[in-house]
């Protein structure tokens, strides 16, 4: 982060203390800040529903599972949109944008597809029927569709799946052509994880975009899932460099499934600070690249995160805790968005297809930021003893260290000093 990007310091003066993430993101030049929706929680958890439906906080929704193949066509030719409609209906009711996810993916694929005895003609017919029906059902509602998901494995090779075995890489342009025919007006994305590290997997994803383009098929965007680890997230500059590898090909980019998990729990106060800085670097990199259109977190509360089920002993990867309190990560994101709001970057030429009013006029009181638990002083009748408190967490260079509403660290790592920029924002300089 450059000093000058923070020192544009009408900063939060242009964004009052009540400003929320989507509102700030739009002011900063992005199209949206959004969240995934956990279908099973929306009707059973009122607090979850209230925050998710706050259009100043989240301007876009994406279904976590409801539009995947196993949900929409569990048996051949038998379509069920009940789960996918939960998110689509909620977005429409609230006036939020909708990202749609996903069409061609090796996982959550019914056995009748993955184990079928196909040739090119028969599998293409299956793909066409699926894409026509699913995209047809949501036609006109989706800003973008993740057409192909995770086609590259962790070693940077083409992922072995039924589509690759039958078509080779021809299934990639085929998928995008079928999607374009089904809904000509939505944006068509390739979506994957670990592209952020700019290694062999990223190289292969660049090749994928070129394969689709060279075949004359349409591809509009690349989604960076952003499933990252606290302390191992690339820097803001490194992330922006990777984003530009794709925008230079003429496609837009977005962070589509962002979460940053702690590898050890419970997280220390210092780890929470690091997590906040990592989130700020991701969001900041999107602000730094004109072709980056938005950020979506993969659910917003630790209560409904997929991480603990997949990575044992890890988690707390989101911006609200399990009790719906805003974490330091939320504050870090809001700060980096507010810093850019007075001097937003150039935006790309298209807009999210959402109603003109993108956030509500009525406001709700956000849940309080939880206070850190400090061990209490204990004594005995014989010999007084004191439990030593953990060291005060320290903010890194460029990080926020104070201001109205700030509940994070107020001490900077040496040799940096906590410097007042305005009443709302103090920074380690």
UniProtKB/Swiss-Prot annotation:
Signal peptide interval: 1-19
Disulfide bonds: 286-292
Protein family according to the UniProt entry: Belongs to the glycosyl hydrolase 10 (cellulase F) family.
Transmembrane regions: none
Domain CBM1 intervals: 393-429
Pathways per UniProt: Glycan degradation; xylan degradation
UniProt-listed Enzyme Commission number(s): 3.2.1.8
Secreted among keywords: yes
Catalyzed reaction equations: Endohydrolysis of (1->4)-beta-D-xylosidic linkages in xylans
One Gene Ontology MF term: endo-1,4-beta-xylanase activity
Induction annotation: Induced by xylan and Avicel, and repressed by glucose.
Protein name: Endo-1,4-beta-xylanase 1
Organism whose genome encodes this protein: Humicola insolens
Phylogenetic lineage: Eukaryota, Fungi, Dikarya, Ascomycota, Pezizomycotina
Pfam families (alphabetical): CBM_1 (PF00734), Glyco_hydro_10 (PF00331)
Enzyme class of the recorded protein, top EC level: hydrolase
């Amino acid at each position: 982060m450059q000093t000058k990007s923070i020192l544009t310091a009408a900063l939060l003066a242009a964004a009052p203390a009540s400003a929320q993430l989507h509102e700030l993101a739009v002011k900063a030049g992005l199209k949206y800040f959004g969240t995934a929706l956990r279908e099973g929680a929306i009707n059973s958890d009122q607090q979850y529903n209230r925050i998710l439906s706050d259009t100043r906080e989240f301007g876009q929704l994406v279904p976590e599972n409801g539009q995947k193949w196993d949900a929409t066509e569990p048996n051949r030719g038998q379509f069920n949109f009940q789960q996918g409609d939960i998110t689509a209906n909620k977005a429409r009711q609230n006036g939020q944008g909708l990202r749609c996810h996903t069409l061609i993916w090796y996982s959550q694929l019914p056995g009748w597809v993955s184990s079928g005895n196909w040739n090119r003609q028969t599998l293409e017919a299956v793909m066409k029927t699926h894409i026509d029906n699913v995209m047809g059902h949501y036609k006109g509602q989706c800003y973008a569709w993740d057409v192909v998901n995770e086609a590259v494995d962790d070693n940077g090779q083409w992922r072995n799946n039924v589509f690759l075995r039958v078509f080779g890489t021809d299934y990639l342009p085929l998928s995008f052509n079928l999607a374009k025919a089904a809904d000509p007006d939505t944006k068509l994305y390739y979506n994957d994880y670990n592209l952020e590290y700019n290694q062999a997997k990223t190289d292969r994803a660049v090749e994928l975009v070129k394969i689709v383009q060279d075949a004359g098929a349409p591809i509009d965007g690349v989604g960076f899932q952003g499933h990252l680890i606290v302390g191992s997230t690339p820097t803001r500059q490194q992330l922006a460099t990777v984003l530009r590898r794709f925008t230079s090909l003429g496609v837009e980019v977005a962070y589509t499934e962002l979460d940053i998990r702690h590898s050890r729990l419970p997280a220390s106060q210092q780890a929470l600070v690091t997590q906040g800085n990592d989130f700020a670097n991701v969001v900041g990199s999107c602000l730094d690249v004109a072709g980056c259109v938005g950020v979506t977190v993969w659910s917003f509360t630790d209560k409904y995160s997929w991480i603990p089920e997949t990575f044992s002993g890890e988690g707390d990867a989101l911006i609200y805790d399990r009790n719906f309190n805003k974490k330091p990560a939320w504050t870090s994101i809001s700060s980096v968005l507010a810093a850019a709001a007075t001097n937003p970057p150039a935006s790309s030429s298209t807009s999210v297809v959402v109603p003109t009013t993108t956030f509500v006029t009525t406001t709700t009181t956000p849940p309080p930021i939880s206070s850190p638990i400090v061990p209490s002083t204990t004594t005995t009748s014989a010999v007084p003893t004191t439990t030593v408190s953990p060291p005060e967490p320290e903010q890194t260079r460029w990080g926020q260290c104070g201001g109205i509403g700030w509940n994070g660290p107020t001490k900077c790592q040496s040799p940096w000093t906590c410097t007042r920029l305005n009443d709302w924002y103090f920074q380690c300089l």
